[in-house]
């Protein structure tokens, strides 16, 4: 079954709604200066909400930040996963993070396919996941699903998370694409710039085929 990730959560209420809907991942942006960036107190409240929800893992999203900062926040917030969205050396982070912490590395499709494939091969058995997104990430731009399906079929051993332009209306189709094991949404479950509990529930249900 495909796992749903609700990202860009900015408060404990939205985190709790995502967990209650059955999201496997709840993500918060830890990159300074972004629209969805959370402060320290909000991050702690979100972490507490997710810790109380069995089956939901907390993800911190980072971009080109010092490893020391990422590792500190991983420890302080009890992050179950670290998501890297920049030009980071994923292997260096993997070597420093606890083995139990999932490392998600974002790649732009189709530009970074070779790099994604190289990580997949090098990271076997090391608790890592490829994420395919549009350039910039968080833009709501949809990838070329026909090209992605062809790539996934040609590399059947690669399982990945898909982001970019996902909504409750199209996630069921996205979940059926070859290689997709997780789907990542942010703006697609918002109304007026805020997370919408009904859209979150619909997204998770449609992703899982409920």
Curated annotation (Swiss-Prot):
<keyword id="KW-0413">Isomerase</keyword>
<comment type="similarity">
    <text>Belongs to the TrpF family.</text>
</comment>
<dbReference type="GO" id="GO:0004640">
    <property type="term" value="F:phosphoribosylanthranilate isomerase activity"/>
</dbReference>
<keyword id="KW-0028">Amino-acid biosynthesis</keyword>
<dbReference type="Pfam" id="PF00697">
    <property type="entry name" value="PRAI"/>
</dbReference>
<keyword id="KW-0822">Tryptophan biosynthesis</keyword>
<dbReference type="InterPro" id="IPR044643">
    <property type="entry name" value="TrpF_fam"/>
</dbReference>
<protein>
    <recommendedName>
        <fullName>N-(5'-phosphoribosyl)anthranilate isomerase</fullName>
        <ecNumber>5.3.1.24</ecNumber>
    </recommendedName>
</protein>
<dbReference type="InterPro" id="IPR011060">
    <property type="entry name" value="RibuloseP-bd_barrel"/>
</dbReference>
<dbReference type="InterPro" id="IPR013785">
    <property type="entry name" value="Aldolase_TIM"/>
</dbReference>
<keyword id="KW-0057">Aromatic amino acid biosynthesis</keyword>
<dbReference type="GO" id="GO:0000162">
    <property type="term" value="P:L-tryptophan biosynthetic process"/>
</dbReference>
<comment type="pathway">
    <text>Amino-acid biosynthesis; L-tryptophan biosynthesis; L-tryptophan from chorismate: step 3/5.</text>
</comment>
<dbReference type="InterPro" id="IPR001240">
    <property type="entry name" value="PRAI_dom"/>
</dbReference>
């Amino acid at each position: 079954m495909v796992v749903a990730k609700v990202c860009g959560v900015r408060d404990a209420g939205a985190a709790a709604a995502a967990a209650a809907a059955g999201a496997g991942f709840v993500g918060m942006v830890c990159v300074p200066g972004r629209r969805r960036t959370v402060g320290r107190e909000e991050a702690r409240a979100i972490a507490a909400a997710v810790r109380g929800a069995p089956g939901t893992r907390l993800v911190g999203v980072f971009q080109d930040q010092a490893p020391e900062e990422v590792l500190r926040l991983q420890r302080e917030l009890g992050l179950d996963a670290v998501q890297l969205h920049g030009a980071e050396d994923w292997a260096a982070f993997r070597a420093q993070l606890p083995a139990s912490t999932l490392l998600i590395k974002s790649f732009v499709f189709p530009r970074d396919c070779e790099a994604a494939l190289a990580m997949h091969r090098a990271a076997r058995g090391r608790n890592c996941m490829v994420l395919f997104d549009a350039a910039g990430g968080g833009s709501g731009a949809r990838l070329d699903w026909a090209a992605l399906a062809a790539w996934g079929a040609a590399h059947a051993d690669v399982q990945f998370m898909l982001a970019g332009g996902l909504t409750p209306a199209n996630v069921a189709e996205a979940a059926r694409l070859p290689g997709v094991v997780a789907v990542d949404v942010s703006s697609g479950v918002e109304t007026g710039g805020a997370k919408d509990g009904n859209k979150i529930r619909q997204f998770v249900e449609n992703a899982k085929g409920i």
